[in-house]
C-alpha cells in the first residue's frame, strides 16, 4: 500500500514541478485573459468570470511556458500572450463541447450551459475564440498564426468526426485515435510547438516538441476516456459513465466489443442503438469491462504513447525543464486529480 501512495505522490509531483517552474508566469497569463475578456455586456462578464473562477489546471498554457523556457525564450512577454491564446482556445472548445454533450458538470462544478443555456454558451465560446485571434494577430508571427488557426480547425473537425461515429459500436481503434488526435492532442501539440517557435529553434526541434505534445495529448485523452468507466467524482470532477450515457464510443468500449462473447456484443449493440441508456445498461457494461480487464488494457495502450512522448525529448540537451516535461508523461496517465 505504501508503494502505491509513493507512486501517486511522485506522479502528482511531476505536475507540481511543472507548475512551480512557470508559476510566476501563469499568474500573468490569467491576468492577461481576464483583461482581454472585459466586456460592457453584463452577461458576457458574468459568464467569462465564472469560467475563470472554475478553470482547470491550465496545463496547456503551462506547456507553452515550459516549452518556451526549454527553448531559451526567457525575456519578453510573447510566451505569456500565446499561452493565454492556447488557454482561450481550450476554454472555448470546452464550452462548445458541453453544449454538444448536454454536459451539466465539469471539474465538479456546474457547466456554463447548465446555468445560462446553450445559446449563450455557444456565443460566449465564439467570443473567447475571437479574442484569442485578436491576440494572435497582435503577436504578429505568421507561423504562430498559421499553427493556432489550423489547430482550431483541426479541433472542430475532430468534434464533427466524433459526432459522425456517435453510437457506432463497430468503430475501429484507428478512427478513435484520429478523433482524439484532432480534438485533444492537436492543441497539446501546438501548445508545445509554440515554445520552439518563440525560441527560434530549427524544424527538427519544433517537430520534436510537436510530437511530444501530440503523444502527451493522446495519452491524456485515453486516460480521460478510461476514467469514465473507472472514476471517482471527488477526485476527477466527473461522474462515471458520462460518455456511455452520451453514446460516445471510446477506447474501453472498442476493446470490449472486440473481446467479449457474441451475446455480450449483442447487448452492447442494443445499448448503443437506443436513444438513451439506463443505469442498468451501464452496470452490465461495467461488469463485463471488469470481466475482461479492459481498464488495464487501455492503460497498456496509453503506455505506448507515453514512450513516444518521452523519446521525442531525447534530441534536447539535458536540463531541468527537459526533466520536468519527461516526468509529466507519467502524470498524464497515472494522475490522481
Tell where the protein language model's regions lie, with residue ranges.
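All-alpha prenyltransferase/terpene-synthase fold signal
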Residues: 1-337
Amino acid at each position: 500500500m505504501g508503494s502505491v501512495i509513493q507512486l501517486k505522490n511522485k506522479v502528482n509531483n511531476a505536475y507540481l514541478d511543472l507548475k512551480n517552474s512557470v508559476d510566476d508566469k501563469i499568474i500573468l497569463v490569467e491576468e492577461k485573459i481576464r483583461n482581454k475578456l472585459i466586456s460592457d455586456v453584463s452577461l458576457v462578464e458574468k459568464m467569462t468570470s465564472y469560467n475563470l473562477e472554475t478553470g482547470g489546471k491550465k496545463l496547456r498554457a503551462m506547456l507553452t511556458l515550459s516549452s518556451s523556457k526549454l527553448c531559451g525564450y526567457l525575456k519578453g512577454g510573447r510566451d505569456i500572450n500565446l499561452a493565454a491564446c492556447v488557454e482561450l482556445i481550450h476554454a472555448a472548445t470546452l464550452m462548445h463541447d458541453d453544449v454538444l454533450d448536454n454536459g451539466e458538470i465539469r471539474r465538479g462544478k456546474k457547466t456554463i450551459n447548465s446555468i445560462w443555456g446553450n445559446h449563450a454558451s455557444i456565443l460566449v465560446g465564439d467570443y473567447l475564440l475571437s479574442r484569442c485571434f485578436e491576440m494572435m494577430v497582435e503577436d504578429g508571427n505568421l507561423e504562430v498564426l498559421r499553427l493556432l488557426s489550423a489547430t482550431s480547425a483541426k479541433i472542430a473537425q475532430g468534434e464533427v468526426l466524433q459526432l459522425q461515429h456517435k453510437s457506432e459500436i463497430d468503430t475501429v481503434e484507428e478512427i478513435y485515435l484520429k478523433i482524439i488526435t484532432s480534438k485533444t492532442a492537436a492543441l497539446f501539440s501546438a501548445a508545445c510547438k509554440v515554445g520552439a517557435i518563440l525560441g527560434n529553434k530549427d524544424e527538427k526541434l519544433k517537430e520534436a516538441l510537436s510530437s511530444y505534445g501530440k503523444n502527451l495529448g493522446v495519452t491524456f485523452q485515453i486516460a480521460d476516456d478510461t476514467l469514465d468507466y473507472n472514476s471517482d467524482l471527488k477526485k476527477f470532477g466527473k461522474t462515471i459513465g458520462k460518455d456511455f450515457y452520451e453514446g460516445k464510443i471510446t477506447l474501453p468500449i472498442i476493446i470490449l466489443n472486440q473481446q467479449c462473447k457474441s451475446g455480450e456484443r449483442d447487448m452492447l449493440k442494443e445499448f448503443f442503438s437506443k436513444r438513451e441508456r439506463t443505469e442498468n445498461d451501464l452496470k452490465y457494461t461495467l461488469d463485463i469491462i471488469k470481466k475482461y480487464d479492459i481498464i488495464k488494457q487501455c492503460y497498456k495502450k496509453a503506455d505506448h504513447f507515453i514512450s513516444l512522448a518521452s523519446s521525442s525529448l531525447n534530441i534536447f540537451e539535458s536540463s531541468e525543464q527537459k526533466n520536468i516535461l519527461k516526468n509529466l508523461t507519467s502524470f498524464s496517465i497515472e494522475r490522481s486529480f
